[in-house]
Design a protein with these regions (language model features):
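Long lumenal/extracellular ectodomains of secretory and single-pass membrane proteins
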Residues: 1-288, 298-411
């Protein structure tokens, strides 16, 4: 669940930490778990093939040993599936995206590339009888491995191959993955920022034709791949392109595709913490809270549909117009006050007011689920807005229970 990019949290580093600890205690179980990160037969894997280099890098950071047995297992597993892909290529069958994520020889993971290459073509190393021949054998391993990866990448029509070869006009927009689209959409549209304005990046016809292909695709398709993107990434992109209608349309369609993996969640209230502490870590906590809050408001039932409660030192209800796009919802929430406090107790009083004003009976109110999207740096509470005294010796939960109990008795 922690690593699952479709139905779980999609956490990377936390998953690597958990798996590493598990692997040390139960090696066979660790092997099985990692394989499910990268491949599951007839089903979407929990992670992606990029986990190969990421997990190996994590093991090195913990052990300072690039020859650790966990890394050796991952290398063997990777080349096993690479061989299977090559066999499928010769039969013109579908292959995985593994070759796209193999570390490159000139990248920061070049040590892993070399390890993979020598593992795949170890027969060349066994025949070397002196240091010069061994050096030549290693180079032969690297060369053959590069060719193998290149052959597979051409077969799966990887956009990066066409980008590197300057064959931009032949990139097929519908073949571009969600992550590649997010990272390279400016390049695909042949644009760059010049101060506050967007200008043409290159005058080459090759790039202009690519831009026209993507514009046509964006305008004619109802959705753009976005299922594997994190909600915070989409919120971040929405804020980044707040003055760019063309990019907003792309982000809105990716959000629509991303939302298809979620279902209706019943009587659920989204409570979004907009206090200053949420802006740590490049605002990732805040962007996650906004994105998840919007998603919950879209999937909840009638009473709280299109509504979000933000809370810092002063909670506030935000009601979305039913015709608002995802980007417009992000900009609307941007107007929420970004205070330095988190008054959770007052937020709970706001929810109680809605329940009382709508004459919702206690038995129905008890079925509500409140999802709190916060780093939980919450203020202490002594008095409420009704002037009622709350014991400072009680926990906040006790005070909230007393508040709702009193309202239930008066209903």
């Amino acid at each position: 669940y922690t690593r699952d990019i479709e139905n779980g949290k999609g956490e990377r580093l936390l998953s690597y930490r958990q798996l590493y600890s598990l692997w040390l205690l139960f090696p066979r179980l660790g092997e099985y778990m990692f394989e499910t990160f990268v491949f599951i037969e007839n089903k979407h894997q929990y992670g992606y093939w990029g986990d190969v280099k990421k997990m190996c890098s994590y093991v090195v950071s913990k052990t300072n040993n690039s020859n650790h047995y966990i890394i050796d297992y991952i290398v063997n597993l990777t080349n096993f599936y690479l061989k299977k892909d090559y066999d499928k290529l010769k039969k013109q069958e579908n292959v995985t995206l593994l070759s796209k994520w193999i570390p490159r020889e000139k990248s920061k993971y070049k040590w892993l590339f070399k390890k993979l290459a020598k593992n795949m073509y170890s027969k060349y190393l066994f025949t070397a009888d002196n240091s010069n021949n061994l050096l030549s054998a290693r180079k032969k391993c690297y060369t053959n491995y590069r060719k193998l990866i290149s052959t597979l990448n051409r077969y799966i029509d990887t956009p990066q191959i066409k980008m590197a070869e300057k064959n931009w006009r032949y990139i097929k927009p519908e073949k571009v993955t969600a992550i590649t689209m997010m990272k390279n959409k400016e390049a695909f549209l042949n644009r760059k920022k010049d101060g506050t304005k967007l200008v043409e990046r290159y005058v080459l016809e090759e790039r202009k034709e690519c831009a026209n292909n993507f514009k046509k695709y964006f305008n004619t398709t109802s959705k753009i791949k976005g299922k594997t993107l994190n909600t915070y990434e989409l919120v971040r992109e929405a804020f980044r392109y707040c003055n760019d209608k063309e990019m907003q349309e792309v982000i809105n369609k990716q959000w629509a595709d991303n939302s298809e993996k979620n279902f209706d969640i019943g009587n659920t209230i989204a409570m979004v913490d907009t206090s200053g502490s949420m802006e740590s870590d490049n605002s990732v906590p805040l962007y996650n809270a906004i994105g998840l809050g919007i998603r919950i408001s879209e999937k909840t039932t009638t009473l709280f549909k299109d509504r979000i409660l933000t809370f810092d030192n002063q909670p506030k209800w935000w009601k979305f117009d039913e015709n608002m796009t995802f980007c417009e919802k992000c900009y609307y929430l941007r107007r929420a006050p970004w205070g330095m406090n988190t008054n959770f107790y007052l937020a709970m009083e706001f929810i109680l007011d809605v329940i009382v004003q709508n004459n919702i009976p206690p038995e129905e109110a008890s079925n509500f689920t409140m999802i709190i999207l916060s780093d939980m740096q919450i203020d202490a509470s002594i008095n409420d807005i009704r002037g009622n005294f709350k014991s400072k010796f009680n926990t906040m939960m006790d005070n909230i229970k007393d508040l709702y109990k009193k309202a239930g008795l008066e209903s």
